[in-house]
């Protein structure tokens, strides 16, 4: 809806301000970013000059919409602040076998993954489990099973239940929820009442230093925490 678009824009703008502040210390940073519409709003609103920063996608590609892929968002973000960037060309949700052979044989991919693993700032969106599963063109009966197993939220191709349990994960190169404790600053960027459960599931599944959200989602999360 139009209201959702406004919320995404505002959240993206707020997250851009926070990121600019973090990068303003003049140090060299590696920033990993995920894909999605809210993250695209962040990239569109970033300002300042940070030539010593390197921006990388948190994971490989997802879906057909190139504008919303992490690679594209990393590029736009870097170009808007005079930073450098790397791209990761690994298809989303390949078999573990194919993924391992890509990582073993493609030194370019391996080099980018190594940089991603050194990120000291991560900015990521949060998806609703059913919506993200449809984006990944999962079979309807598989999506139903995910939901029956309790999946409500998704980040980094990992599907989480409301209690933070990990229900399912897709194979991909890059960051996973398990990597988050090693990263200096983790910023989640998501809002809207419809995403409240998803946000809480991902926070519980990993760790979050800063959550940029809106009042509707925040109220909803607060209510769930009181229950």
Residue ranges and their predicted role:
Residues 61-227:
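Conserved phosphate- and dinucleotide-binding cores of soluble alpha/beta proteins
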Residues 32-38, 191:
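Glycine-rich beta-strand-to-loop/alpha-helix junction loops that act as flexible
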Residues 38-52, 134-143:
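Short Gly/Thr/Asp-enriched flexible loops that form oxyanion-binding sites at enzyme active sites
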Residues 52-62:
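Catalytic or ion-translocation cores adjacent to nucleophile or general acid/base/metal-coordination motifs
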Residues 3, 38-39, 62-63:
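A short acidic, glycine/proline-enriched capping/turn motif at secondary-structure boundaries
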Residues 1-32, 44-51, 65-67:
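HTH-adjacent hinge/linker in prokaryotic transcriptional regulators
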Residues 9-17, 37-40, 107-110, 114, ...:
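Short, contiguous clusters of charged residues that form electrostatic/catalytic patches at enzyme active sites
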């Amino acid at each position: 809806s139009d209201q959702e678009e406004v919320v995404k824009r505002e959240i993206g703008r707020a997250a851009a301000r926070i990121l600019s502040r973090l990068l303003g210390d003049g140090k060299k940073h590696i920033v990993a970013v995920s894909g999605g519409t809210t993250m695209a709003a962040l990239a569109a609103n970033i300002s300042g000059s940070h030539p010593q920063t390197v921006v990388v996608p948190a994971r490989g590609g997802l879906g057909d919409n190139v504008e919303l892929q992490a690679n594209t968002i990393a590029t736009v973000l870097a170009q808007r602040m005079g930073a450098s960037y790397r791209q990761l060309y690994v298809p989303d949700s390949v078999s573990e076998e194919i993924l391992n052979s890509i990582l073993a044989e493609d030194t370019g991919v391996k080099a980018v993954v190594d940089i991603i693993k050194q990120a000291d700032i991560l900015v990521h969106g949060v998806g609703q489990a059913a919506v993200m599963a449809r984006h990944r063109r999962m079979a309807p009966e598989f999506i139903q099973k995910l939901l029956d197993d309790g999946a409500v939220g998704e980040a980094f191709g990992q599907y989480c239940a409301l209690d933070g349990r990990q229900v399912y994960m897709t194979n991909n190169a890059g960051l996973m929820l398990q990597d988050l404790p090693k990263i200096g600053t983790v910023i989640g960027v998501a809002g809207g009442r419809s995403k409240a459960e998803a946000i809480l599931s991902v926070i519980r599944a990993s760790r979050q230093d800063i959550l940029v959200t809106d009042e509707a989602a925040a109220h909803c999360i607060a209510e769930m925490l009181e229950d």
